[in-house]
């Protein structure tokens, strides 16, 4: 099976009531771990790369690593997704490099730091949708800024994140604006702001509805029942990995991620894509620290990196099971980008909101 568009997987997930973890990748070991977990659980795969990942690995290296995964595991549907595109040009360069899905994050201006107006967000996202859909490529948009409801601050990831602090009106997606945004842009997926943020330091205490607004997802889903929703910054920050890192010389303070049971609530309310990066970073770090400490005389990097694949595979397999993704890869039928482009052109994939349906 060739690379597939995101819309194919999200439509299947919606029809069958499950969510799909979208794992960020930078290197060979991450891709191997994710695909091993996918084969183990018969799960479809979303591999996503930030601008930072593309710069770190190099366009050609990253593209060929993912294409190698497609060749090695032809029975697993794989999406190649651009995470947090800061401008149309970023999305277009991703499409040129075989990405089958792009995120136009117009919640921030092109500097990836300044919160953007609603009008700006609509305009840049719609521009990308028009170009991408003509090629059969899927588009994810974002409304609201990712950041902590505890502090009002965001966590920059690869240079992407607002500076300073914002109030709750900017940190929570407005349901009315969400309806207007989806109608105006026709995005395939909508990332919503509910109090999550990038990195390991998401919450200083176990999150409750006061600082993790799953109820906002439920409200948006009631207004947009046919729209695929996305949760960003949704690593769960496993306590066992934190403990292992600190046991072998780390110094990560007490911190909390997004509980799996809260993500599962989101999936019941239309969340189809769940972004995860930190959990795999913690798995790598725990494995490498442990291997280095137990055999300090070792100098072959494979001694440190092979355990990291095992640790990440365990995390990924757990998420595939917990989100209901497992068992679905073999049920998804290939549809080409060309066929998707034709469907977009005919209006067959237009998102119809409740508000639009009443008109």
Swiss-Prot record:
EC annotation from Swiss-Prot or TrEMBL: 4.1.2.13
Cofactor: Zn(2+)
Pfam families assigned to the protein according to its UniProt record, in alphabetical order: F_bP_aldolase (PF01116)
Cofactor binding notes: Binds 2 Zn(2+) ions per subunit. One is catalytic and the other provides a structural contribution.
Pathway(s) this gene product operates in, as recorded in its UniProt entry: Carbohydrate degradation; glycolysis; D-glyceraldehyde 3-phosphate and glycerone phosphate from D-glucose: step 4/4
Biological process, per Gene Ontology: glycolytic process
Binding site for Zn(2+) 1: 84, 198, 232
Keywords from the UniProt entry: Glycolysis, Lyase, Metal-binding, Zinc
Binding-site list for Zn(2+) 2: 105, 142
CDD domains per record: TBP_aldolase_IIB (cd00947)
Positions contributing to D-glyceraldehyde 3-phosphate binding: 50
Keyword Transcription regulation belongs to the record: no
Molecular-function GO terms, alphabetical: fructose-bisphosphate aldolase activity; zinc ion binding
InterPro entries (UniProt xref): Aldolase_TIM, Class_II_FBP_aldolase, FBA_II, Fruct_bisP_Calv
Amino-acid positions noted as binding dihydroxyacetone phosphate in the UniProt annotation, renumbered to this chain: 199, 233-235, 275-278
Substrates-to-products reaction catalysed: beta-D-fructose 1,6-bisphosphate = D-glyceraldehyde 3-phosphate + dihydroxyacetone phosphate
Positions annotated as active site in the UniProt record: 83
PANTHER family reported for this sequence: D-TAGATOSE-1,6-BISPHOSPHATE ALDOLASE, D-TAGATOSE-1,6-BISPHOSPHATE ALDOLASE SUBUNIT GATY-RELATED
NCBIfam families named among the record's database cross-references: cbbA, FruBisAldo_II_B
Entry similarity comment: Belongs to the class II fructose-bisphosphate aldolase family.
Protein name: Fructose-bisphosphate aldolase
Organism: Nostoc commune
Chain's gene name: fba
